Design a protein with these regions (language model features):
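Non-transmembrane domains of secretory- and envelope-associated proteins
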Residues: 21-26, 128-130, 140-147, 155-204
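N-terminal leader/targeting segments and the immediate start of mature chains
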Residues: 12, 16-58, 65, 69, ...
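Surface-exposed, polar helix/loop patches in the mature regions of secreted/periplasmic/lumenal proteins
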Residues: 89-144
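Short beta-strand segments that buttress and anchor functional surface loops
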Residues: 49-53, 71-76, 133-141, 161-165
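Short, solvent-exposed coil/turn segments at beta-strand boundaries
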Residues: 42, 64-72, 81-86, 128-129, ...
């Protein structure tokens, strides 16, 4: 989970405190969240820097690129490319490259803990000095992350930070250098020539 915690990055104005799926506040919150979510995971692509603090367990930072179903991330030890068909995970310490099908949950045994279905949450938004704070609370009987607090910029709607509760721990993610759009598809192509001396582990 430690090396793949970046994937939980973003799967993600009116100061009322009303929960539900049909209040003016919840509708506004959902619309705002959907816009930010599209800026991150839409076909135009995005790039950002992240700093993750998995409270009491782990800290890491890196850069990540998204474009539709494609992704790439770079940390100190782990690098990964997902071109929509094949997922390559590079361990620079062990000098290995592990291959999985892009959509396979097997590439990350913890991925089920971070499944995100927008319809499984109630939405709430409030205005703060730092930005708009959108809170997503898991509906009763649904599975997924229990609570998500997404802070977004009031003008651009770009993500600023995420606070995610899974089971009994919190993950805090600060986001910087966010850019939406102009992401070339070549970004997600695994540079095979750079890793000829590595051991390849094919789990497809």
């Amino acid at each position: 989970m430690k090396q793949r915690i970046a994937y939980i990055i973003l799967i993600l104005c009116f100061p009322f405190n009303v929960w539900g799926t049909d209040t003016p506040n919840s509708k506004q919150a959902r619309e705002m969240f959907d816009k930010t979510y599209q800026m991150v995971f839409g076909e135009q692509g995005c790039s950002l820097h992240y700093d993750v603090n998995l409270i009491g367990l782990y800290k890491t930072s890196g850069n990540i690129w998204y474009k539709g179903e494609k992704s790439k991330f770079i940390e100190k030890r782990y690098w990964a490319w997902n071109d929509g068909k094949t997922h390559h995970m590079v361990d620079t310490k062990k000098k290995t490259v592990t291959l999985h099908h892009a959509k396979s949950d097997d590439k990350d045994k913890y991925s089920s803990n971070f499944k995100f279905e927008p319809e499984n949450y109630n939405y709430n938004v409030e205005s703060t000095n730092e930005g708009y704070l959108i809170t997503l609370k898991l509906k009763h009987g649904c599975k997924g992350m229990k609570l998500i607090k997404a802070l977004i910029d009031k003008k651009t709607r770009a993500p600023i930070s995420l606070k995610i509760k899974v089971a009994f721990f919190w993950a805090n993610i600060n986001i910087s250098n966010f850019k939406s759009g102009n992401i070339d598809n070549s970004t997600f192509v695994f540079p095979m020539n750079q890793y000829k001396t590595y051991t390849f582990i094919d789990k497809r």
